[in-house]
Amino acid sequence: MSINWLTHPFEELSNLKHSLDETLKNWTEPAPTAATSMDWGWKPRMDVCENKDYYKIILELPSFNKDEIEVQVNGRFLSIKGQKIEHTTDEWKYHRRERYSGGEFHRAVALPEGIDGSSIQAKFQSGVLLLLIPKTGGKTSQHISLFGREEHGNKRNVIDLEEKERKRRMEESDPMLGRRWGTGRSLFSGSKLNNQNDTMYRKPSASDLRLVKQMETKERERRIRDTKGETEKKKNALKVSRYIKSLGMNPRSTLRRGGREMEKIIHLEERERQARIRDKGRMRQQQALAKKVSNLIKHSGGAARLRHTGFNYSTITKGYNTNKTKFDRFGKENDSFGGFNINKSFTNQFKGFGKNSGGKSINITTGGFKAPSQFNKFTHNLEEKERQRRLNDKKGQNDAKRLAAEISHMIGNAHF
């Protein structure tokens, strides 16, 4: 057995006594629970106590930082985990090593039913982890954040700064909040205002209150005026609506009957209406003339015969050429129409009809009118009238379009 020269004999005896005490303690304690069986690795020292409202758990975790510890509640079990990297060097040779040197540990504690995991308070300070667990019911799973004394102080400073900034912004938007801020700050931050600060807040409160009352009075008067103005607008709009309804189907022309622009527009509309009336009369005349020409062409036997005569000469030469009989332009007997005489004396011969007349000639005297020349002139006059009608119709349509465009332009520029 090797003896360590750095170890004192009485210290060795003390270590042996400690080992015997731990062994006897394990024999006298009950069997390990499920929570104890869940532990592994290095086991930090832990105390568990309670009062009527809380459970308190204290663990000794020397040389640990709060970032290396994880506390979590899962159902009835409180889980505490930690891991620390072991740093070993070859420069030093250890003769005794009792301090925690690194690795991973896990402690689990079984708690009664109804633990409020969301309300657990954790504090880590000077290598000691303190957990306060309320006995009331709550969430069954919760991750607990740890704050040491230094972290608590820093967070308190941050909260105070945030409250001051919020106070400044609120007072800028509403001066009346200057007095009420003291009560709100004492509630939020947990600190009470001293007399000096209270006096500072009390001084501008009276003037701020007067200012707020004046602003509220002005706002109320403005709303009253606004409501009154809206009522007047509604009444005027109702009057205008009733008046416009009484004007009939065309209220725009009635509203400004005496204006120059309206009179000019009315005059142009009247001209356009008269032009439409004249155009309709002209169209009726043109339709009658076109029907007349159409009937003439239809009864003449075609356009080829219109160039020579308006009737069938073969019918005349077969029994009616011996008497002085008057024929109309359709080859029928008619004394009322401008006729012509048929005699034996021939002044004009039409050899083109010799075959149809059996070799005889036809003489048309000057007592009526010569069928070929006079009838062609009559037809030509009708065709010329039809052509002029069409030209006039196009001209009238162009005039009507120009007049309508002028009316539309003037209506667009008119102010009603």
Swiss-Prot record:
Recorded superkingdom: Eukaryota
Task: Tell me which InterPro entries the record gives.
Answer: A-crystallin/Hsp20_dom, HSP20-like_chaperone, Small_HSP
Which segments constitute the sHSP domain?
Answer: 37-150
The UniProt keyword set, sorted, is: Stress response
GO CC terms in record: cytosol
Q: Which CDD domains match?
A: ACD_sHsps-like
Asked whether the keyword Aminoacyl-tRNA synthetase is assigned, the reply is no
* Pfam families associated with the record: HSP20 (PF00011)
Q: Which Gene3D superfamilies match?
A: 2.60.40.790
Which residue ranges does the record annotate as region Disordered?
Answer: 216-235
Q: Which family does it belong to?
A: Belongs to the small heat shock protein (HSP20) family.
Name the PANTHER family on file. HEAT-SHOCK PROTEIN 20 FAMILY MEMBER
Q: What is this protein called?
A: Heat shock protein DDB_G0280215
